[in-house]
């Protein structure tokens, strides 16, 4: 949620969106990225931010936890007239575990009178497609099929949601079917803000987190591969260039990939409906929704498009490096 740029508006309404947990190294993120790492002693940490967090072992992980909690407490102590505090990070869903939910509950219940968890739940196949685009933006190099195979646990929604339900109770967990047609102004931020009693927040703000198009994923993936072979870090500017030039619908799962995961989707879907189905807001997706997708939309991208992505990637990198050399004179 992109509420970080609207802190003053929120604060005037008695809502805090803390800065604690958003800064990693020299970058400030729109989400509370560090919170998950502070609440757990296990779980993956991307190598791209590992050094910035200063976590190398269990001892430094515990130190990071204490540091982050101190940051939150110091910021909370400064609030005046605040009745609601918002924490936001999709990784709290993606990497949900009993350990994370238990530690989060201990942290929150010691500081707040009431905790409400809001989850906007996207259809599993669309979630994988969207997350693949984010994977490539973050420097990933996998093909779509390889990414799906490695991240199949992402679509086990029951495993992602039930730890929170078990710790906070079903009445505190609000699951909303992600369909822009049913959101306030078709916007997630505006919809969430309205649930906090705010109108007009987010709807006019252009969403910066647009997905890469099919060609965009090919282009940026090849740029990532080029810098990997050079054993150097991809310049952030290249991500911005490709994101601006090649935004759009991300690659769809082709028929072969979809067939390999439909059983996993069905099992988790049935478990989710059996446990919290009655509390889901909005028209929820069904298995038939995914099975009815036209075959034409599930076709592989093709070798020609992949080759075009490689050609454009080389051109983008060459142009970028040429401009840097020219500016140095």
Would you name each region that the model predicts?
Residues 1-329:
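Anion-recognition interface
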């Amino acid at each position: 949620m992109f509420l970080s740029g609207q802190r003053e508006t929120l604060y005037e309404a008695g809502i805090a969106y803390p800065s604690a947990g958003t800064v990693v190294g020299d970058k400030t993120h729109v989400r509370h990225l560090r919170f998950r790492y502070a609440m757990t002693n296990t779980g993956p940490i991307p190598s791209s931010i590992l050094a910035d967090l200063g976590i190398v072992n269990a001892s430094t992980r515990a130190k990071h936890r204490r540091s982050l909690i101190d940051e939150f407490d110091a910021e909370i102590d400064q609030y005046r007239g605040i009745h609601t505090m918002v924490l936001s990070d999709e990784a709290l869903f993606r990497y949900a575990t009993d350990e994370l939910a238990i530690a989060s509950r201990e942290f929150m219940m010691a500081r707040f009178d009431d905790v409400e968890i809001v989850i906007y739940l996207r259809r599993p196949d669309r979630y994988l497609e969207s997350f693949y685009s984010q994977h490539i933006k973050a420097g990933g190099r996998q093909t779509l099929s390889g990414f799906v195979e490695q991240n199949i646990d992402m679509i086990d929604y029951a495993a992602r949601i039930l730890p929170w339900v078990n710790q906070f109770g079903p009445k505190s967990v609000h699951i909303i079917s992600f369909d822009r047609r049913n959101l306030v102004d078709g916007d997630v931020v505006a919809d969430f803000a309205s649930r906090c009693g705010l109108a007009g927040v987010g709807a006019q703000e252009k969403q910066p987190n647009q997905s890469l198009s099919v060609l965009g994923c090919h282009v940026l993936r090849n740029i990532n591969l080029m810098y990997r072979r050079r054993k150097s870090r991809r310049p952030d500017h290249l991500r911005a260039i490709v994101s601006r030039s090649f935004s759009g619908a991300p690659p769809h799962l082709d028929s072969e990939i979809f067939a390999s995961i439909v059983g996993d989707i069905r099992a988790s879907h049935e478990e989710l409906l059996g446990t919290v189905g009655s509390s889901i807001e909005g028209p929820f997706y069904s298995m038939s929704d995914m099975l009815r997708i036209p075959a034409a939309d599930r076709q592989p991208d093709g070798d020609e498009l992949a080759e075009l992505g490689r050609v454009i990637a080389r051109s983008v990198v060459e142009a970028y490096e040429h401009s840097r050399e020219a500016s140095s004179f």
